[in-house]
């Protein structure tokens, strides 16, 4: 026997491979080191490394200087290569790195390089025999007999399990996977073919497979031709693609499982396996009954094997049904977990029963023909076995081609069908004559509609589990039928169609409804149809309103009509047409109801509206939670009303003089927040403390009332309400029901009183549960005056047209008369106001005063009021933080300074010609009662400030209430008499000087003195920007004095 020619691919595969190296992962590092070592030049000596290290520490990375310092013909590249090789070590600080470390690293480098060179020589020497060994091993000899295969494998196998392998192959036993990492479970393998395929290259293996398949196909064609000569079978002609359809079915797998031992013994014998198949087929042809029972057993075995391997494909129509159900499950259309499992199990049972019915007689007439065709069943099983031996890719390609042909055929049928309006009767006729075919047509069309959809819907019919399996069996029995009978049925004679219509009319209505319901449930998995069913239900409810717009169409459609129209006709319609009409009808209905409601509301009179409101209020108060809310919100006893009428924040605003202002600026709020501090957290401890305060207040009020009754006290404080007396009408909370009722006081005790309720009798009620029928009569006197004042202020504001003034009735401001605005200094906000307003006035002198004067006045007044409020707030806060003695000093200094400035200004304004101004001012100050030193200092200070103001020609107003724009700033005569005096600034300067003088006369705490200086310096802020440099100098000097004073504070 001539030797087989070698395959070039075997040698190519081994000759193109490179020999593996142990140091393959270090190849890049070795290359990099070789490059750096090449740049290093000859080996560096110890002296050169010491010189390099010293020069590097001295010159850094200036490699020319470093190379010149080594003086041993070392170039710049060599020096730089040495640095790059030891960059990480040389980057360390000088104390950490050293010369000895660098020398050690280079010595190690050179030793490593020498070792790697010697290892490379060893690898090169051992590379050649390894390649030769691989080439020798890759020469398998091809042989057809199993004995020669065993000999060749025994020669080439390196392990020592040869005897065991021979025994296992000879006895036909099954090997087990006994590797180190494999589980100890039996593995289904084929012995000889796997060994041969593992030792042969892939191209030879594929060639062998195709040759074997061609031989099998040729042999099976001959066998089928021989069988067809004996007697033709309609099953073979009806299913030209039978081989592809039944390639994965259960009888094939069971056939291979039953003949596994014979195939394992005769797998390597080329033509013996086909002879055995022919003998077995001829034996089955002799006894038809035995063959029928054998096929039934094969089906049961396949049914048991198919769920284990995870394949649920049985026949063609079963595939269609399961694809439909799996598609719906994959798209998330399962109703619930239990329903999904139940539906899967039912579909599986139905498919198994349908596959059994393939071989069961459909009618009693064909039962004899079924028994006589056992031989053809055996041939059919042989064809299935041949299909199982085909390659998987060919089977998949044939299956995809078949599915494409079916889709195109169905699309042609769909195009040839009539529209929905004219085809409802034909659909019904088809459903009555051939219910199985029509139902299959609906299912397949639903499946195609699902595949054509771009968006998967999550809506699914919950009735899919209710479909009985008996209804599904006729579907699968006709699964091998094509669309041709349906096309021929459409071209039937007119007499046959008339018979169909007559039969349809004779059927009962209930039976038609049941059939349509089954169709609807089976097609309910389609999202489009489920949506249309929901639309129909919605339209049934709104049929009256929809008929107005669409009188010619019958909107209320029954489920029978929807099912007869078919899913394809439903999908052809626009999806939102009915929804749009429904929305329009609902909108029109809402508009009509609104118009009628408005007309009814306009026609009502005022009394009817009041009665309606009363009814609504009574209805809301009928709920216990609403009454409880009203009690908490508005029920206050005579004792608790003054306590809850007070608010600490409002008291604070009244104290600083801002209680009457409806809106505060950002500056004012920032000052208030900074002065109040951090608010408390609403916690249980806070509530406990507040309740304790309320208890103490109640006890003190009761004590006052008891003393008043006994005669120990003649009157009550103005902040306490009048006590309740016998005979007063009250609104009390009943102690049993905790509901409010009207009553009358019979007796009064320390903290309780007897109340006679109108309908419930006499009960003992706490004083905190009794509210006067008219709370204004029992209001404290101080609170009454405040409320009256607030009401009067509100009326004045309404009369003046200022509606923005909001005054609270419960929390009115108090103590406004105690706030003085005469000593409030200006702040920084006014510094830029005066020049802007001055420019506006000068630019608007030529314009009519009727248009601009009122605007400027209003704007100036608002700004001035805002500045004054900020000044008053800051001043009040400063005074609140001061000690009483310091507060007296500030007030006294400002009072005396104001009097002195007024006297000096009056004297300077009354000077006549020829008189000395200084003399007149000194006389005026003597009248005030100050000594000569103070008078001389005051005059000098006054001359200095007055001169600076006159030099800049921008005087400040003498009165804070007068606006800046109203001053005659642009007067033509420049006489000093008409010039306005900066009285406020002068007063602030004199008051500051007096404060400092009074602090030096007595010894005060340094902290209080520093606080007083801060308040004095703050009051000196000028309005004119030209005076800011002088103010900065004063501020600097005062800061030094404050630092010296604070240094005396004990720590």
Swiss-Prot record:
Region of interest (Disordered), ranges: 1-37, 114-158, 170-210, 225-293, 323-375, 397-605, 948-981
Comp. bias intervals (Acidic residues): 323-332
InterPro entries listed in its UniProt record: DIRP (IPR033471), Homeodomain-like_sf (IPR009057), LIN-9/ALY1 (IPR010561), Tudor (IPR002999)
One of the record's GO cellular component terms: DRM complex
Pfam families (alphabetical): DIRP
Keyword set includes Ion transport: no
The entry's keywords: Nucleus
Basic and acidic residues: compositionally biased ranges: 120-130, 279-293, 350-372, 403-417, 586-597
SUPFAM superfamilies: Homeodomain-like
Record's compositionally biased regions (Basic residues): 1-11, 27-36, 131-140
Location within or outside the cell: Nucleus
Biased composition (Polar residues): 560-574, 967-981
Tissue: Expressed ubiquitously in vegetative and reproductive tissues.
Domain spans labelled SANT: 39-93
Domain of life per record: Eukaryota
GO BP terms, alphabetized: DNA-templated transcription
Location, primary (coarse class): nucleus
The keyword Nucleus appears for this protein: yes
Subunit structure: Interacts with SNL1 (via PAH3).
Protein name per its UniProtKB record: Protein ALWAYS EARLY 2
The gene coding this protein: ALY2
